[in-house]
Curated annotation (Swiss-Prot):
Family to which the UniProt record says this protein belongs: Belongs to the DIP2 family.
Subunit structure: Interacts with FSTL1; DIP2A may act as a cell surface receptor for FSTL1. Interacts (via N-terminus) with CTTN (via SH3 domain); the interaction promotes acetylation of CTTN and is required for proper synaptic transmission. Interacts with SHANK3.
Alphabetically ordered keywords of this record: Cell membrane, Cell projection, Developmental protein, Ligase, Membrane, Mitochondrion, Neurogenesis, Phosphoprotein, Synapse
Membrane topology of the entry: Peripheral membrane protein
Protein name per UniProt: Disco-interacting protein 2 homolog A
InterPro entries assigned: AMP-bd_C, AMP-bd_C_sf, AMP-dep_synth/lig_dom, ANL_N_sf, Dip2-like_dom, DMAP1-bd
Entries under Gene3D superfamilies matching the protein: 3.30.300.30, N-terminal domain of ligase-like
PTM annotation (Phosphothreonine): residues: 132, 155
GO MF annotations in UniProt: acetate-CoA ligase activity
UniProt short sequence motif PXXP motif, positions renumbered to this chain: 283-286, 307-310
Start and end residues of each DMAP1-binding domain: 9-127
Cellular component aspect of the GO annotation: cell surface; dendritic spine; membrane; mitochondrion; plasma membrane
Amino acid sequence: MADRGCPLEAAPLPAEVRESLAELELELSEGDITQKGYEKKRAKLLARYIPLIQGIDPSLQAENRIPGPSQTTAAAPKQQKSRPTASRDERFRSDVHTEAVQAALAKYKERKMPMPSKRRSVLVHSSVETYTPPDTSSASEDEGSLRRPGRLTSTPLQSHSSVEPWLDRVIQGSSTSSSASSTSSHPGGRPTTAPSAAATPGAAATTALAGLEAHTHIDLHSAPPDVTTGLVEHSYFERPQVASVRSVPRGCSGSMLETADGVPVNSRVSSKIQQLLNTLKRPKRPPLKEFFVDDFEELLEVQQPDPNQPKPEGSETSVLRGEPLTAGVPRPPSLLATLQRWGTTQPKSPCLTALDTTGKAVYTLTYGKLWSRSLKLAYTLLNKLTSKNEPLLKPGDRVALVFPNSDPVMFMVAFYGCLLAELVPVPIEVPLTRKDAGSQQVGFLLGSCGVFLALTTDACQKGLPKAQTGEVAAFKGWPPLSWLVIDGKHLAKPPKDWHPLAQDTGTGTAYIEYKTSKEGSTVGVTVSHASLLAQCRALTQACGYSEAETLTNVLDFKRDAGLWHGVLTSVMNRMHVVSVPYALMKANPLSWIQKVCFYKARAALVKSRDMHWSLLAQRGQRDVSLSSLRMLIVADGANPWSISSCDAFLNVFQSRGLRPEVICPCASSPEALTVAIRRPPDLGGPPPRKAVLSMNGLSYGVIRVDTEEKLSVLTVQDVGQVMPGANVCVVKLEGTPYLCKTDEVGEICVSSSATGTAYYGLLGITKNVFEAVPVTTGGAPIFDRPFTRTGLLGFIGPDNLVFIVGKLDGLMVTGVRRHNADDVVATALAVEPMKFVYRGRIAVFSVTVLHDDRIVLVAEQRPDASEEDSFQWMSRVLQAIDSIHQVGVYCLALVPANTLPKAPLGGIHISETKQRFLEGTLHPCNVLMCPHTCVTNLPKPRQKQPEVGPASMIVGNLVAGKRIAQASGRELAHLEDSDQARKFLFLADVLQWRAHTTPDHPLFLLLNAKGTVTSTATCVQLHKRAERVAAALMEKGRLSVGDHVALVYPPGVDLIAAFYGCLYCGCVPVTVRPPHPQNLGTTLPTVKMIVEVSKSACVLTTQAVTRLLRSKEAAAAVDIRTWPTILDTDDIPKKKIASVFRPPSPDVLAYLDFSVSTTGILAGVKMSHAATSALCRSIKLQCELYPSRQIAICLDPYCGLGFALWCLCSVYSGHQSVLVPPLELESNVSLWLSAVSQYKARVTFCSYSVMEMCTKGLGAQTGVLRMKGVNLSCVRTCMVVAEERPRIALTQSFSKLFKDLGLPARAVSTTFGCRVNVAICLQGTAGPDPTTVYVDMRALRHDRVRLVERGSPHSLPLMESGKILPGVKVIIAHTETKGPLGDSHLGEIWVSSPHNATGYYTVYGEEALHADHFSARLSFGDTQTIWARTGYLGFLRRTELTDASGGRHDALYVVGSLDETLELRGMRYHPIDIETSVIRAHRSIAECAVFTWTNLLVVVVELDGLEQDALDLVALVTNVVLEEHYLVVGVVVIVDPGVIPINSRGEKQRMHLRDGFLADQLDPIYVAYNM
């Protein structure tokens, strides 16, 4: 233990002083005395010896395990820091490592890092059970074995001999004697000829540590959790229909932080984001190549190796041969022959003693009983189980053995019974529930092995989960099984002359042992009869087993060393095995030592966990003696962290008769069985060794002995020599199995007759593992027989001893470096281990995100841990891992105590934990993601190249044979001269004409929630109501021509009458959505703003709304004294007006159309009379609207196309409109569809909100609707009115769902309009169906269109937005050069049409909107036409389809609004694409919205599930955005359903959401700031 650097090591201390010190250590460790008390007592004990100790050179420490005469047998413990409480969670622990971690942490400056915000309800998230019996669980599948008992590691003197001189020889190879001498004169020095990079690992590490201060500085004392409660009350169901405009404060003080658009921010949120930004501004670790390029500057490339990384320099290794198997004593030809021999010649000899949970021996199985009962079982299996007079089982069939860990006797009988019957036993764990951790994979194993029968005991079967029939339940993923109980009374006695035919010497399968891989898949390793026999013989020779010896077995007897030693080899040697069950170990950790003492056992089989547990429980047990032991086999010696348990155990129990040479670590793997085992000196074993290795070197697969730099080292002990008769070599991990160099870590491979032979039934993966052919550098095979890969990583050291530094299953490869999961666990536990992690339960694994392994650490926190503790611990763990391993942790999650899935005999079920993490069912209570520091292989930020000029672009397109992207709707017939055109120029004239010619023709029908007609309007009724409104405006309102009037009405006929009333008296109407009574605070300011901004001289409304506008509640939201005149039109007198106002010119303003954009900008556009009638005419032609038609409209009537369809089109075309207010659907979802069916509407319009409501609300009710007679076969076109990219998923699911009600598959389409032109595209009744194309989303980010096949990676479906309307011309122009673009090129959609709006009346929220929106000209080509810029990106594509006019059809595809796009890393992202990915990430995500804040991407998700599941989403959201969009999410905000504001068109108001977030008004469930 040279690395412990203990100054006390050379001083002889009397045994009683050593014992007192050990007890003192333990009292401190269990919290019985304080640190101060401990130091006082310790000083007193050591006072007499201190002078002897001072000044001894540590390099002179003795290094042999077997003490010579001059050496004493133990040393005093080192002084340690206090450990607050007693617990058994001290795993993976080592003093040196703990000190290293604390030293590393001390180097960090305290930096501010934002602490996650959590709602109080989420804080109350306690453990499943606050206390369970001690169960130290490890992150490895080795049942929690890996612990480094911390303060108990009093460094023993009989320390291992050092590996350093050997390694130096190895690396030098044939270096000269002078360099060798120079090396030997400096312990651990390097030859002068070695490259400088390798020569100074210490210096390099110091530099690295200095560099550490440049990043990951994390504040350990952040602000307390940000708990925001009750700020905004949102109903769970009703989404606030926010159309409110973002108010812009004027004249704010300069010091006040403002958002990009001037929203004042003084909240905690923004200060946290500031902290986060400050953290992120620090430089990242530089050496890794940060970016990559490909044809799209997009494919992630492998990171380039660091030129300074250590490289192996030794010579090539060779095959290491174990000693030959001794011929010696003649042995029986097979294990069954041996069993028969002992069963008949030594029937009374004890074979196996089973203990109960109190430690009492409940039954001793003799060899006679084992033989007779196994025979009985074999006979029963072969002769008494029949189906249809056929024997159920044939030789070679596989049979599952399901026995609890407490019943070794029945297991042994079953195992040998199967062997005698020539059946193949497949031992598995007892299933405890229907859905145990890993149950599905056990099912896969049973299925792949073709198992259909399971053997068990009566007691065990009673305890299995049952189905309602009383039968054993069907377990998740398992094949159908028959269960056979094999207790004595169920077995038949064989006739005297019956003998089994067992052939058990050849290559036939003897048994199958299960193995769970890193990814969680469970496979069966086939062990042949020959291998089984060879293994027993090799173990007998290596361990020197002899007849009638007693072995105490603490391991699981169903598999691994517990099976090989305790069930198989023991029988070969007629040994007596005392089996200690797991339950007894948990109740009394000293039980195995007591049994060793009681039975005078010569050998014991344990794991380091068992040694550690007994250390914690050994006080007061002075009467135990371990002097009978000649071998204490440590089965998990292959775990590098087992060394501490071994040393600490020896330190304490040496005084109780334990000899140092007795401790024998071994290494094994399911595929190769036992690989190596340390032999005691009397069996010819060399002295034990240990190596202190640089973790940095190991991460590059290179062995470097570390001397100076103790911060990141791994101390490993040898696992002895290879097995007798085996050949072992070390090969490279990836690619062809080339032999490693002597100073290189590789995978240990074994060639021997005693290994497994295959993965049962899985030929594909068998070949790679069981038939490896290692080759030399020159490519020549090294041996004539194939090797088996063990999955163990290590090297061959001095004296041909094997050293293991990790397992392939625990390997995480980040970039070019390799890290071992167990090492990371050890580092995390060294950070205040006792205080925080519940029973040391930590799982570390890697997940692949963006083509690289990312490290995830999950720990159980103590039930009493506060938020502050959690955050502080997480911060420190990140620093420690960064410092010790130089690697970032991608995600750190804390879960409540007792919630991680457990492996069968203790330990954490890693693969199940990983599965839950990826599925979002882990339910953490704290999460910290650090993608910014870990993800260094993002694509290169896009550098904008100087653009090609517009002229060159046109020429380029011509040369390429591409047409200019331009398209137009049908030509409008020249009706300007005719009567009708003049007559239809003004809508007021049209209404009067209709009232005169067809007075009783019904125009409007308004439905309520019950589907009954609440009001109607014929032509004459509407005319008369309009006259009354006009008279009231002129008389009561005293308005003059040209005044603006705000119409604040709920959807209905009153609104239409008020509109025409305004036209009749020459006023300009402005439709405004009335405020929501339950949500006045957010909706009333918008009303007030539109009234003020539109300069309305009067407000027309109903009595109910008038009361609302003047109410006390309204006064709290706005200044109600400043309303203009408010007129209610409920009871206005019947009056005529002298004459209807006729505008002097068609270009006079007809109405103002105000709308809030999704970016929160309130924009009003001017519509002239000419544009209004042109709009109506275009829609009439496209939809073939005549007076005989009925159309159903379920839209909000306040702006855009919704307003035009509700108020204008019926009057112009004369068709009847069935009006369905969308609000009514909240109380009757089927209202709209029932109306469509009832009125047999051929054409219907709705919004996305309506469509979504129907899809979600009526999904399960189509049958009920059909019975009510709802039939949608009348519909020819159902159009979604939208100002966005078509939502394909929604329209498709709507079509699919209502196909059952007769809705034609081709009926659903979308419209497209925007502020400059409310109706550009609309499907109509004629022409081809809308087409869908698939584009590459990555190309889209670079403003390019690349058409791909459906289903190809990164493909995005885009549906054509209906057909271009008559009279409308569209061209695609470059956003910056304003030049025309070619077919299928992405650019801004420009539109020219008689119904374009004539300009903005006003824009509020961003006054700098360009004046050229309505009067743009191309910079090249046709520079005369006046175009309006829509502000939307899209492309035109000529299809193969034929238009109504006979020409080829041009399809317009809308990609998204330019205002909404996010510019990140030089690329253009559309929020909807990121949101779609996020919504797909987890079933609990109901809705999602993204926005940026100071270059950080903020993702807000609505959680439709339990609050305690909220944190599952953080990692999934981060993963999916990285994977699919190559973006790092900065902040994840989890909110309640309905928090994301949505406008009447169903569009997300992302900027309102952003303002709400920054002003701390969202009342989030959780806010995670990704580091």
